[in-house]
Regions:
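N-terminal ligand-binding lobe of clamshell/alpha-beta domains
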Residues: 1-142
């Protein structure tokens, strides 16, 4: 099992090493989870986002670890992508602001179990971000 684990670890390290740094003009993404919860520098989610080729609004606003964004901050900074969690039927006050009608025009992607732990599955999350970045670039011509 050790050899198999080493091979998986090497493959993951190789995949991550072959990703380029995020360009200054890369799409801007905002983590906007229930209650405005946002993730900044020093989090796995931020690392996934950057490895996928997007900038993180929370980091540009100086967030270290986690914090909160207001609806007004999100609208003011006009991120290219909103990243939220899956919503479920019913009503939750914590989800009220992330369902606000003013956010309807923003492309939205949802985190999944691939974002949770630093396992080789994070490559799936990175690939999801990269696909969204590519889709935005195709649409805008950048």
């Amino acid at each position: 099992q050790d050899a198999k684990a080493d091979a998986i670890a090497r493959a993951l390290e190789h995949d991550l090493a072959n990703r380029s740094d995020v360009a200054e003009d890369a799409p801007l993404a905002a983590f906007f989870l229930p209650n405005g919860y946002a993730l900044g520098a020093g989090t796995l989610s931020h690392d996934i986002l950057v490895a996928g080729g997007a900038r993180n609004l929370s980091v540009e606003l100086g967030f270290q670890g986690n914090g909160t964004l207001s609806l007004e901050q999100v609208i003011l900074h006009q991120p290219d992508i909103l990243i939220g969690s899956q919503t479920y039927p019913g009503f939750s006050l914590s989800e009220d602001m992330v369902r606000h009608p003013s956010l309807g025009e923003f492309p939205m992607m949802h985190t999944s179990v691939d974002w949770v732990c630093g396992t080789p599955l994070v490559v799936n999350a990175i690939d999801e971000v990269a696909a969204q970045v590519e889709k935005l670039r195709d649409r805008t011509g950048n």
